[in-house]
Amino acid sequence: MIFLHQMLMNAPVNLPSEDIGTPVSVKIRERVLAARKRFHANDNIAEFIQPGELDHLLDEVTEKMQTVLDSMVIDTENDHNTQDTARRVAKMYLKEVFKGRYTESPEVTEFPNA
């Protein structure tokens, strides 16, 4: 994966246009790589997310989270306690844990030291 990342960072800037059926995470990653910016966990990538894509990213992460729950052998269909857990966890990560990653940074206001 590190080799792939290094290879993509050195790739030409003219990456393919957004294809129908391509996961939104791939589209966002392509934009970040094309700009030759890093995307570590604490980096803000909001400038590379187009309007409406965060909702699609939530759907994508929900699907991935559901596969994690399935791999953990958790019955999310018949256990009312775990229904919609994949969506709740995905939402928690995107809108709470990593909120500063996907939204524009607020304006910084300086106050004089009194």
Language-model-derived ranges and their functions:
Residues 11-114:
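Active-site loop/lid in soluble adenylation, ligation, and acyl-transfer enzymes
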Residues 1-7:
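Short, Lys/Arg-enriched N-terminal segments with co-localized hydrophobic residues
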